[in-house]
């Protein structure tokens, strides 16, 4: 089982997609999030012995440190890595403090997801001046210091993102890239130009899929561009998927008070809790399933539902369909290029092993 551990809700940045939205007026959501847990605290606030007892029941557990910015509590991270009865750790970080993490701990991390949105202008516009240079420098430093795990550029994209340019730029520095659209997570649709931009995005995705396949044809290696990687593997194997991030059945989030939510975005949504670390068995957590209208969609087996939180709360109400249109475009673009990949497989210049990757590692897969 995979677990996100929210080490702290505090953060040292105020990115436009995240904390800056606290100051914006929101449109009413389509549905209520239900009962709100008011015992959530800013920092991890339960005995670590309870966490270790919980994890001990699943020797194959994977623990991902998230926040806020988890490295604001490096002390807790080091303590947990020293004493938790598991061997697999991951980290999601904005990169500002990563260079200060002791090398021997950095190099134990199986995967590091580091936030960066594209080139310098785009990243600094949304995350703060100097962030791009800091992230690129930090990524290079940890590699020089012996980090051999997977380093994933984790992008957030919005209306000023040219998806083709942003991804191909980052491909100069990262072999693994994931992007998530800032869409249908808060009630901000009325002051967005998403409907217009999504047409540009869809065209960019079609161009980017073709570029991805061209790179495979030239090199025989599959770039780990996650929205293409996992989905293409399943299309080739004719395999369907539930929610691709794993939330609510393979991937759960441990909040600062010890309660277990199906997803990091669903912090405090008490009606959807899967238990508490004090008494829960990680091997027998209840599944929190996706609901309609996703289940009746003809490409549900490809998409899996995109986002459990959005499916429940409907921040964009009926306009969620615009997001669905981008997913259908992704599906169609991959299907269109699948014969090129199948040809390489048939000729023996490419093997299915080239698509190997870790699922549920913090990449939502469906943007």
Segments the model singles out, each with a brief description of its role:
Residues 48-64, 73-184, 194-196:
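Radical SAM/AdoMet-radical enzyme domain recognition
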Residues 1-46:
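Canonical Radical SAM [4Fe-4S] cluster-binding loop centered on the CxxxCxxC motif
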Residues 18, 125-126, 266, 310:
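Residue-level signal for well-ordered alpha-helical positions
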Residues 10-12, 70-71, 96-97, 119, ...:
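Short, solvent-exposed loop/turn segments at secondary-structure junctions
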Residues 37-42, 124, 282-285:
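A short acidic, glycine-rich active-site loop
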Residues 6-14, 69, 248, 294, ...:
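Cysteine-centered iron-sulfur cluster-binding motifs in ferredoxin-type domains/subunits
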Residues 27-35, 46, 129-136, 140, ...:
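Radical SAM enzyme [4Fe-4S]-AdoMet core and its adjacent flexible, acidic
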Residues 265-367:
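Flexible mid-to-C-terminal extensions adjoining Fe-S/redox cofactors in radical SAM and related proteins
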């Amino acid at each position: 089982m995979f677990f996100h551990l929210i080490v702290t809700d505090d953060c040292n940045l105020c990115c436009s997609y995240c904390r800056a939205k606290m100051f914006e007026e929101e449109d009413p959501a389509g549905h209520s999030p239900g009962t709100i847990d008011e015992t959530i605290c800013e920092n991890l606030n339960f005995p670590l012995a309870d966490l270790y007892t919980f994890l001990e029941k699943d020797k194959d557990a994977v623990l991902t440190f998230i926040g806020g910015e988890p490295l604001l509590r490096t002390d807790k991270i080091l303590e947990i890595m020293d004493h938790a009865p598991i061997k697999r750790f991951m980290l999601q970080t904005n990169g500002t403090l990563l260079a200060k993490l002791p090398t021997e701990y950095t190099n134990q991390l199986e995967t590091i997801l580091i936030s960066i949105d594209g080139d310098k202008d785009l990243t600094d516009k949304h995350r703060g001046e100097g962030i791009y240079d800091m992230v690129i420098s930090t990524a290079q430093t940890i590699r020089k210091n012996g980090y051999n795990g997977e380093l994933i550029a984790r992008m957030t994209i919005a209306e000023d993102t040219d998806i083709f340019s942003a991804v191909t730029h980052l491909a100069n520095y990262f072999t693994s890239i994931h992007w998530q659209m800032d869409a249908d997570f808060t009630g901000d649709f009325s002051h967005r130009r998403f409907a217009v931009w999504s047409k540009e995005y869809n065209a960019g995705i079609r161009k980017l899929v073709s570029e991805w396949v061209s790179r495979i044809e030239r090199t025989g290696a599959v770039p780990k561009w996650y929205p293409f990687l996992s989905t293409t593997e399943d299309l080739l194997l004719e395999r369907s998927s539930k929610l691709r991030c794993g939330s609510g059945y393979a991937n759960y989030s441990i909040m600062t008070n010890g309660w277990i939510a199906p997803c990091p975005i669903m912090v405090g949504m008490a009606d959807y809790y899967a238990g508490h670390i004090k008494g829960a068995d990680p091997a027998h957590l209840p599944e929190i399933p996706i609901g309609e209208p996703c289940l009746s969609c003809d490409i549900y087996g490809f998409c899996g539902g995109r986002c459990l939180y959005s499916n429940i709360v409907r921040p964009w109400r009926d306009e969620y369909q615009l997001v669905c249109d981008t997913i259908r475009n992704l599906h169609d673009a991959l299907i269109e290029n699948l014969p090129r990949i199948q040809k390489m497989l048939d000729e023996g210049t490419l093997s299915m092993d080239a698509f190997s990757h870790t699922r549920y590692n913090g990449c939502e897969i469906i943007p």
